[in-house]
Amino acid sequence: MTNTPAPRARRSVLSRGSWSETARIAGILRKETVGGAVLLVASAVALVWANSPWAESYFALRDLKIGAEPFGLHLNLTLGTWAADGLLAVFFLVVGLELKREFVAGDLRDPARAALPMAAAVGGMVVPALIFVAVTAPVGDGATRGWAIPTATDIAFAVAVLAVISTHLPAALRTFLLTLAVVDDLLAVTVIAVFYTDEINLTALGLSIVPLALFALCVQRRIRSWWLLLPLGVATWVLMHESGVHATVAGVLLGFTVPVLRSVAAGGPEAGPGLAEHFEHRLRPLSAGVAVPVFAFFAAGVAIGGVSGLTRALSDPITLGIILGLVVGKPVGIFLTTRVLTAVTRANLDDALRWIDVFGVALLAGIGFTVSLLIGDLAYGLGSDRDDFVKVGVLTGSLVAALIAAVLLRVRNRHYRAVWLQETADTDRDGVPDVYQSQRD
């Protein structure tokens, strides 16, 4: 008699990760919550000011030129451009550090765990882009150039929504949302570098490699002196800006050079965190609390022109394409990709979750703000009529996506609270919740 082998247990997707990873992500989201609140205030101030009797002073401030052109470098820029090209480089530097850490020591280092958020991010990029192109293609005259606008996720805005509705989102969903946003940022940087670069100065681009390589050499040798690293970083940014490639790409490349783990010569991973964590700890408050809100202040201000102006903006195909892309395309792309990949790999959703939870998180990912506004500026030009339509579309689409997500997640909050109580219970008071200890056992 032959023994029938026992059926293999199905793999579970969106399951709870390790305690160290969960604690790290919780810390990041706490900081992003504060940054999200500042971001919302800055955007609200810009909108009110731009539609007040003093609107001219807002636009005069945004368009005020500051800088010089030493050695022929084009650095005499408006304050709005300094915010978009300069301050956002700090944001993308943190993105680079985050990406490097995820690929080296986070969820993305494991192909099995990385496949789902990476595929979901791609799905969440393709579907809204297709919707935008379908809506704007009949217009012609370069309207489809903004196809990438509704493809981005603003994690600070998303976690601010979570804070407002006081939901206890399970650790697995928080991890999925953050990882999704990180991959989204990687895709956004790639899109900006490839599709929104018109002319390239190869000499400046080649020269930018020199300070970038010196920066990499310093951080690999664990040199932390900002007196040395800051000039090298600024030089990389200036030359990248001069090359025609969007200068925020320099931030990501600088972040990629920073080591996540300590080298053997420095004591190895057991000796403590690598330089990437140290830099991220220092730079994230600057990014979330200053760089992104200041950019939002200069980018979100749009003169709506009363009810008639709002009606005109909302009826424009560019505005409609963005709203539909964010509210419909983004969540549907993420949800369907996740559902299909789960079915194809014959996996099961974690027992603590339901598919409605995944759709709620996918709706949060439809909140596209910072990067969406940046791509709008690049696609149509800062201050143009179409750029104003982009702002109305991004603000409206993000607000609608946030409201629907808030309602959906709030309905499930009783269940989330039960999961949260289980995930935070620490009966032996050793600082590690019991569920994570049982995972190790």
Swiss-Prot record:
Pfam families recorded: Na_H_antiport_1
Lineage: superkingdom: Bacteria
Reactions that this protein is recorded to catalyse: Na(+)(in) + 2 H(+)(out) = Na(+)(out) + 2 H(+)(in)
PANTHER family: NA(+)_H(+) ANTIPORTER NHAA, SODIUM ION/PROTON ANTIPORTER NHAA-RELATED
Designated name of the protein: Na(+)/H(+) antiporter NhaA 2
Major location (coarse): membrane
TM annotation in the entry: 34-54, 77-97, 115-135, 146-166, 176-196, 199-219, 225-245, 249-269, 290-310, 317-337, 355-375, 389-409
